[in-house]
Regions:
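N-terminal helicase ATP-binding lobe
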Residues: 1-707
């Protein structure tokens, strides 16, 4: 950018400041930084001054700063757990200051705001005893664990799985379904954090049960918390509600990057179908961009369609890393795995169904500046599952899954993935469909009857109205009449019951009271002969699987050998039954969560109500870890694929079948053995195994801090 142009831009920004248009001035500064990135300018001092005026202190070029600018850069530095203090921007500092004063906050801020810096700084400065962080997905739980582990694992036990024992100081990072297991473990917690708390509203969460369980967790943990800190993007107003009562709502419309959009849909030719338009223009656009790009496809079917298009249109990458990855996928999953064909073309997939380690590996490859994945095809999982940012976002669809057109709030969340502090000052958005009309987002956290029924009568954590009290009394009376007061009191305190929908719980209780032998021949689930499982599972699986019951049943028989047989053999067996490699992932997820949860609830009810009932916990434990050893399954969340765990087990390095160990015990064993010795113990390892193992070790490594 020419020197004279820089001066003119600075003058324009200064005029905006004089008029009090601070947000416009901030956007102008960010655009200027984008245009001058990597350039040496005689106007650095002037640019620094403007950066300071708009509160973007981390962007100050400290080497050549005036004393005023240098002072601001240093004054806003805080301890975030890194080796050196980091500079916050003005809005981050405002939020952190309020938290350090003991306030409870509900904060709405853009995706690029840097909310994690505030959490890290609070922990580093305040050193709370117990921190509970609720996140919407397991993928986000591991991403958060990796960040906090490297900073704070020397002082805190970082917990992301159920069954873990608490230490003196703990940081729990959990999706709400796992949080129920720990509610009664605390009399008090120092700070309770909910990321993406808008998902407690059924307006924004597709699954009502998930919204209800999040509200229940917010009520239960919120009552035990000295402080609460709830986070969401793009909320304009928070309606008064019992779940955020006593919290200050802070709407921080503070941009650290600028988003610029282009209406690609206007290039659609007359008479051209949308599919033909995408087929013509998308490959062209990706070739033009040649930089990190998220493609929002909206649904699984659309991802399949776009995958086939790109496989046919894009050339094979010259990257050895990507070619190794593609070969690794074919070897460890299936030669027919479409992701392998995409990977060798520099394309990845994020759909919320893949093995967690596999999703992590793709995000890691996407973060590579050279030789990695440049494009990720995604559903809405990319906006709720991870914090990945890109330079470009391409919007191919304006629907969320198979539903009708999404709203402006969802649209803003998707395009908010464009741009990243320090790397992409300007995020570019390419619209293949017309976006929704601009609208302010009002967040209303209703208090559903199902949530009222799930809360404790004496200590609900939130205030009930008269109708809710009457409803709860009626429900309790019905349950006590059905099974007796003692049985009901024993059941309702169990975490598995507290996490369940009250209506589902009641329905299962009624079924078992009417037929104490239900599900028929359930004791057969403890046998090794999978044929014997057919009768009891045929009665349980339809409860959650509906029309997909057949495929779930087939998957259970095949997956029962998950630890015994190689994954390609499991997938080949499923393909013989017309179940695809892509379905393999979603079915395994459904079995390990939905089937395990329903069976655990049935088992708890039977053990309480049916005298002499057989405990099905051994089978439920196997199902909940997809028939892998529990530790091997949990290590996948940490980024270690089952294929490597199996090889390490066969080499005699680890005993993953020792159920007395916690995941933290195994992690300690990995740390003690070290990367080099573990890699050396894997005979004939694949070149990409090294990349995967390094990524895993990065997630269990600490920062060496200066004393």
């Amino acid at each position: 950018m020419a020197t004279i142009d820089i001066f003119e831009k600075c003058s324009e920004i200064n005029d905006l400041l004089d008029k009090g248009l601070i947000e416009d001035a901030r956007s102008g500064v960010i655009k200027l930084l984008h245009l001058t990135k990597g350039q040496v300018s005689p106007y650095e001092e002037l640019v620094n001054h403007l950066i300071r005026e708009v509160g973007l202190y981390p962007y100050i070029i400290s080497e050549n700063a005036s004393w005023e600018d240098a002072f601001a850069y240093e004054a806003f530095k805080v301890n975030t757990g890194e080796k050196e203090s980091q500079t916050l921007h003005l809005a981050q500092s405002e939020v952190l200051t309020a938290l350090l004063k003991g306030e409870s906050l509900a904060v709405s801020a853009p995706t690029s705001f840097g909310k994690s810096f505030v959490i890290d700084a609070f922990i580093a400065i305040k050193e709370p005893q117990n921190v509970v962080i609720i996140v919407p997905t397991i993928a986000l739980a591991d991403e958060t664990r990796r960040r906090l582990f490297r900073k704070f694992s020397d002082k805190y036990k970082i917990i992301t799985t159920t069954g873990a024992n608490l230490a003196q100081k703990n940081i729990l990072i959990l999706p709400q379904e796992r949080a129920f297991a720990f509610i009664d473990s605390f009399d008090e917690i120092d700070i309770f954090i909910v990321d993406e708390f808008y998902k407690a509203s059924t307006t924004f969460e597709r699954e009502n049960d998930r919204a209800n369980s999040l509200l229940t967790v917010m009520a239960r943990f919120g009552a035990k918390a000295k402080q609460r800190y709830y986070l969401a993007p793009n909320i304009h107003n928070l309606e008064p509600n019992v779940f955020t009562e006593g919290m200050r709502f802070m709407r921080m419309d503070f941009k650290t990057v600028v988003t610029m959009s282009r209406n690609e849909y206007k290039k659609k030719e007359e008479g051209e179908s949308q599919d033909d338009f995408v087929a013509r223009r998308l490959p062209e656009l990706l070739e033009e961009l040649k930089s990190k790009t998220l493609v929002y496809a909206g649904s699984y079917n659309k991802i399949d369609q776009v995958s086939d298009l790109l496989i046919g249109k894009l050339g094979i990458s010259q990257s050895q890393l990507l070619n190794d990855f593609a070969d690794w996928l074919r070897k460890n999953y299936s030669k027919k795995f479409r992701l392998a064909d995409l990977a060798e073309r520099g394309v990845g997939v994020h759909n919320g169904s893949l093995h967690r380690s596999l999703a992590q590996i793709q995000i890691k490859l996407f973060e590579e500046t050279k030789g990695g994945i440049d494009t990720i095809l995604s559903t809405s999982s990319i906006i709720e599952g991870v914090n990945t940012q890109a330079e470009n976002v391409i919007l191919l669809s304006n629907t969320n899954g198979s539903r009708s057109m999404f709203d402006y709030f969802t649209y803003r969340n998707i395009i908010g993935r464009a741009g990243r502090m320090f790397r992409y000052f300007v995020g570019r958005v390419f619209l293949f469909v017309k976006p929704p009309d601009k609208a302010d987002t009002q967040l209303n956290l209703d208090f559903p009857d199902e949530v009222a029924l799930s809360l404790d009568t004496e200590q609900p954590g939130v205030e009930f109205n008269k109708d809710q009290k009457d409803l709860q009394r009626k429900y309790h009376a019905e349950m006590e009449q059905l099974i007796g007061e003692e049985h009901y009191n024993n059941l309702k305190v169990l975490p598995i019951v507290q996490a369940a929908s009250p209506s589902l719980f009641k329905e299962l209780v009624e079924t078992i009271v009417e037929n104490p032998d239900w599900p028929l021949n359930h004791v057969a689930l403890l046998r090794n002969n999978t044929y014997d499982w057919r009768e009891p599972l045929s009665e349980v699986i339809p409860i959650f699987a509906g029309n997909n019951t057949r495929n779930v049943q087939i998957a259970v028989w095949r997956l029962s050998n998950n630890w015994i047989y190689p994954t390609p053999l499991i997938i080949a067996g499923l393909e013989q039954s017309k179940v695809s490699v892509d379905d393999f992932f979603s079915l395994e997820r459904s079995i390990s969560f939905n089937l395990a949860t329903i069976l655990a609830l049935i088992n708890a009810i039977r053990l309480e109500l049916v005298e002499g009932s057989v405990d099905l916990t051994p089978f439920i434990s196997r199902v909940s870890s997809a028939f892998l050893p529990k530790l091997a399954y949990q290590l996948e969340e940490y980024g270690l694929p089952r294929m490597l765990s199996k090889q390490l087990s066969q080499a005699g390095l680890f005993d993953f079948e020792d159920d007395t160990k916690e995941i933290t015990d195994i992690v300690s064993e990995f740390q003690q053995k070290g990367y080099a010795s573990i890699l050396a113990a894997i005979p004939n390892h694949h070149p990409f195994d090294e990349y995967v193992l390094k990524h895993f070790f990065e997630g269990i490594s600490r920062i060496e801090k200066h004393i």
